[in-house]
């Protein structure tokens, strides 16, 4: 069987892997994803409004062993894993590998391998993954670009795997503070937007002036993941229709036993409810069946005849 697949034959993952970096509010936004488990490397829970932690399960990481143990537990009740922050996670890996001393050049191979193990293990869970990062800067000529605070090699290795990279910031417009996130790369921030989200999205204020919640914290669930899953569902429906027509074609090809039945198949090939490349696939399947039967194809009449 060929390993080459048409677009309608692909297995499309339904999980989103993203990173959020920037100014205040990153953790709260990350926890707006569906059924999150928070891996708190940064001791950030102490800085969060407790209303945002209601019904949120948290692992307060004290050593890298904590991470290794929790990833062996049954995490089936969670839909999202939040890593807060990925930079601090790297610090735990360095401590795990080097203790209290500074890492040497020889240490970085093991450190990078452990970092890769972590990202692979998270991906294998088949859940939404959200990395939270602090903000750093990078000079590009005269421009200063905001980037996630993460060692360059680690950043370069993980950004290729992300579906989304979002920069969160506060903006003041006519005296009103607005929190926005952009996933588009710009001259002032890194970004990645494979889900075709709007260029700039406003993150709603969910607390009143007294710190009491005014609405549900569900920005990522409703504004990012839900539209993405709707798009995937549309693709899945197309794929199911494609699989259905291929099943019908396969059933009809089982009846092809000679040139007459092969030519009858050709005459009715347009009767199938074709999706995408299914008509081309049907022609290829017929050609394979005809070869198996030893039929001869006439290129001029585009019909088959039985072998002499």
Task: Specify the residue positions occupied by each region the protein language model found.
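Hydrophobic/aromatic ligand-binding patch that stacks against planar heteroaromatic rings
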Residues: 27-30, 121, 157-158
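Long, charged N-terminal accessory/stalk domains
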Residues: 76-80, 88
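Interfaces that engage single-stranded nucleic acids at replication/repair/recombination sites
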Residues: 5-8, 24-26, 33, 211-308
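Conserved P-loop
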Residues: 2, 7-76
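Short, structured coil segments at secondary-structure junctions
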Residues: 32-34, 125, 161
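P-loop NTPase motor core
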Residues: 85-156
């Amino acid at each position: 069987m060929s390993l080459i697949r048409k677009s309608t034959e692909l297995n499309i993952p339904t999980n989103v892997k993203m990173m959020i970096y920037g100014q205040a509010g990153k953790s709260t936004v990350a926890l707006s994803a569906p059924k999150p488990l928070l891996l708190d490397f940064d001791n950030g829970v102490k800085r969060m409004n407790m209303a945002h932690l209601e019904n949120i399960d948290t692992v307060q990481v004290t050593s890298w062993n904590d991470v290794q143990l929790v990833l062996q537990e049954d995490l089936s009740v969670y839909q999202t894993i939040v890593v807060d922050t990925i930079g601090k996670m790297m610090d735990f890996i360095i401590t795990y590998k080097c203790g209290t001393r500074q890492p040497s050049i020889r240490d970085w191979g093991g450190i990078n391998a452990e970092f890769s193990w972590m990202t692979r293990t998270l991906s294998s869970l088949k859940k939404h993954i959200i990395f939270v990062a602090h903000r750093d800067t990078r000079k590009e000529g005269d421009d200063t670009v905001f980037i996630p605070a993460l060692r360059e090699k680690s950043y370069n290795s993980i950004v290729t795997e992300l579906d989304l990279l979002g920069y969160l910031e506060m903006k003041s417009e006519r005296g009103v503070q607005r929190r926005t996130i952009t996933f588009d790369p710009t001259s002032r921030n890194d970004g990645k937007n494979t889900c075709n989200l709007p260029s700039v999205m406003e993150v709603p204020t969910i607390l009143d002036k007294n710190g009491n919640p005014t609405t549900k914290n569900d920005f990522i669930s409703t504004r990012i993941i839900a539209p993405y899953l709707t798009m995937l569902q549309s693709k899945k429906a197309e794929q199911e229709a494609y699989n259905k027509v291929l099943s019908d074609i396969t059933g009809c090809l089982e009846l092809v036993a000679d040139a007459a039945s092969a030519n009858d198949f050709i005459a009715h090939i347009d009767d199938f409810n074709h999706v995408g490349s299914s008509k081309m696939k049907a022609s290829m399947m017929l050609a394979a069946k005809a070869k198996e039967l030893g039929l001869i194809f006439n290129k001029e009449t585009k019909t088959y005849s039985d072998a002499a």
